[in-house]
């Protein structure tokens, strides 16, 4: 199986999560094709106590983020899946040394001149899937389930995350209506090791998800 563009790349992590949910007989709504959920950047809804998709989305959209945690067991929660190819990849430097990726999670503030997917997401949790290429096959390196509210709080509350951790990629020019326009991308780089120290912010679920990762793929 070969995934050749960014949309298909993202489906790798989504397929892994679906395999897990089905194997564990966990009820879920696949809302990736739902226009409202695309706008809210939500991929999956895990309901509780027979609540409907509409009931959960209404609460997610209007409830205060700091109250959501107390309601998730009662009504359900939402998940967005993100694929990352740089956090834990292994690459050779010019001198032959092997380096273990960047060690940073990427929080997208601006992408394609719009709010980034994580900046605008209403998801309760981000399944952050880190992959690497091993020979001709793409393999799972790490899978983190991140509480998005606590991730945002960690970035706000920690003095470390100042301008030196905000990376503006070189301006690119894209064609819109036959005119070249600037395309800006703005990210916050957040070290994994720092987020792992924030209570309740992230769980390393690599061992749990390893057997559900799609086989024989190359991106």
Located regions from the model:
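Non-catalytic C-terminal interaction segments of nucleic acid-processing enzymes
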Residues: 65-72, 113, 131-219
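Acidic-basic catalytic patches of nuclease active cores, encompassing PD-(D/E)XK
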Residues: 1-38, 50, 96
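Short beta-strand or tight-loop elements
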Residues: 40-42, 122
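Conserved catalytic cores of phosphodiester-cleaving nucleases, focusing on short active-site segments
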Residues: 21, 44-50, 54-62, 75-89
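Conserved hydrophobic/aromatic positions in well-ordered beta-strands
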Residues: 45, 127-129, 144
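Aromatic- and glycine-enriched beta-alpha-beta binding-site module
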Residues: 106-140
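Mg2+/Mn2+-dependent nuclease catalytic core
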Residues: 71-74, 85-119
């Amino acid at each position: 199986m070969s995934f050749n563009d960014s949309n298909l790349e993202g489906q790798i992590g989504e397929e892994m999560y679906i395999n897990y949910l089905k194997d564990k007989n966990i009820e879920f709504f696949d809302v990736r094709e739902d226009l409202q959920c695309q706008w809210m950047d939500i991929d999956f809804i895990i309901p509780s106590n027979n609540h409907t998709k509409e009931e959960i989305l209404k609460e997610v959209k209007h409830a205060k983020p700091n109250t959501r945690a107390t309601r998730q067991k009662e009504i359900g929660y939402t998940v967005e899946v993100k694929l990352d190819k740089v956090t834990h990849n292994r690459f050779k430097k010019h001198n032959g040394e092997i380096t273990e990726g960047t060690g940073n999670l990427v929080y997208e503030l601006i992408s394609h001149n719009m709010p980034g997917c994580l900046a605008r997401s209403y998801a309760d949790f981000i399944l952050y899937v880190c992959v690497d290429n091993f020979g001709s096959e793409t393999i799972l390196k790490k899978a983190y389930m991140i509480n998005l509210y606590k991730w945002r709080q960690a970035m706000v509350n920690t003095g470390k995350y100042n301008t030196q951790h905000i990376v503006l990629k070189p301006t690119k020019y894209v064609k819109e209506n036959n005119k070249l326009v600037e395309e800006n991308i703005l990210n916050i780089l957040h070290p994994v090791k720092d987020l792992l120290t924030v209570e309740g912010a992230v769980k390393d679920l690599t061992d749990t998800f390893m057997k559900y990762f799609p086989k024989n793929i190359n991106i």
